[in-house]
Amino acid sequence: MPAPYKKGSEKKGATLFKTRCLQCHTVEAGGPHKVGPNLHGVFGRHSGKASGYSYTDANIKKNVLWDEQTMSDYLENPKKYIPGTKMAFGGLKKEKDRNDIVTYMLKACK
């Protein structure tokens, strides 16, 4: 079972997001979808629901409600958490890295 989410470093999370996520995702309101969906407003939304993005059936059917814990769990191993996801990212194995990136995302994706 994945480790419980704990608030991390927003600054370190921003760096991680830039190097690990930004090539496929945007976070700003009204930002475009890229290879992956725009993540603005992701927290409190169900998986597979970003308007205008074409998700796999797996993401839609999983119907995860994204919060700090579910996002952290997903980022540990996306393909294990949602088998059939398009997300090619292998995951963040270090608990600290997941905490940092989720802490950053909580602010950046509002």
Curated annotation (Swiss-Prot):
It is found in: Mitochondrion intermembrane space. It comes from the Eukaryota. Keywords: Electron transport, Heme, Iron, Metal-binding, Mitochondrion, Respiratory chain, Transport. One of its GO terms (molecular function) is metal ion binding. GO terms for cellular component: mitochondrial intermembrane space. PROSITE patterns: CYTC. Pfam families: Cytochrom_C. InterPro entries: Cyt_c-like_dom, Cyt_c-like_dom_sf, Cyt_c_1A/1B. Binds 1 heme c group covalently per subunit. Heme c binds at residues 21, 24-25, 87. Electron carrier protein. The oxidized form of the cytochrome c heme group can accept an electron from the heme group of the cytochrome c1 subunit of cytochrome reductase. Cytochrome c then transfers this electron to the cytochrome oxidase complex, the final protein carrier in the mitochondrial electron-transport chain. PANTHER family: CYTOCHROME C (PTHR11961). Belongs to the cytochrome c family. This is Cytochrome c. It comes from Kluyveromyces lactis (strain ATCC 8585 / CBS 2359 / DSM 70799 / NBRC 1267 / NRRL Y-1140 / WM37) (Yeast).
